[in-house]
């Protein structure tokens, strides 16, 4: 990723966090944290990684709410970030936090057994 794509990625991460927590009023939207944004070098596509707190059903409902609000989110990003064309976004669940918590739990169990 080039320098400009990195800057756009960081700015999108910040703005998406604000949009998801303050602007979208969908009750299906759970507690969402934007953990990262990968933007292609030509700034045409962005993969948004999110962490969702809750059960599998709540995660599914949150993804449905994000899919429904996709157009609104893109228009808000377009207003906040000066780009010729707003990247096409796809949302993916980031399981790295849950994976890290599981490893910590296993390590604590190993230490308590000794």
UniProtKB/Swiss-Prot annotation:
Subcellular localization(s) per the UniProt record: Cytoplasm
Pfam families: RBFA (PF02033)
Gene Ontology BP terms: maturation of SSU-rRNA
Alphabetical keyword list: Cytoplasm, Ribosome biogenesis
Identification of the protein by name: Ribosome-binding factor A
GO CC terms: cytosol
Keyword Cytoplasm listed: yes
């Amino acid at each position: 990723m080039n320098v400009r794509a990195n800057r756009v990625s960081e700015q999108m991460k910040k703005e998406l966090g604000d949009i998801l927590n303050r602007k979208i009023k969908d009750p299906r939207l759970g507690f969402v944290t934007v953990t990262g944004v990968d933007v292609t070098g030509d700034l045409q596509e962005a993969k948004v990684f999110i962490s969702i707190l809750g059960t599998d059903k709540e995660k599914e409902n949150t993804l449905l709410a994000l899919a429904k609000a996709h157009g609104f989110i893109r228009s808000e990003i377009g207003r906040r970030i000066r780009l010729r064309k707003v990247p096409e976004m796809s949302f993916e669940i980031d399981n790295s936090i849950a994976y890290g918590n599981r490893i910590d739990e296993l390590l604590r169990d190993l230490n308590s057994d000794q």
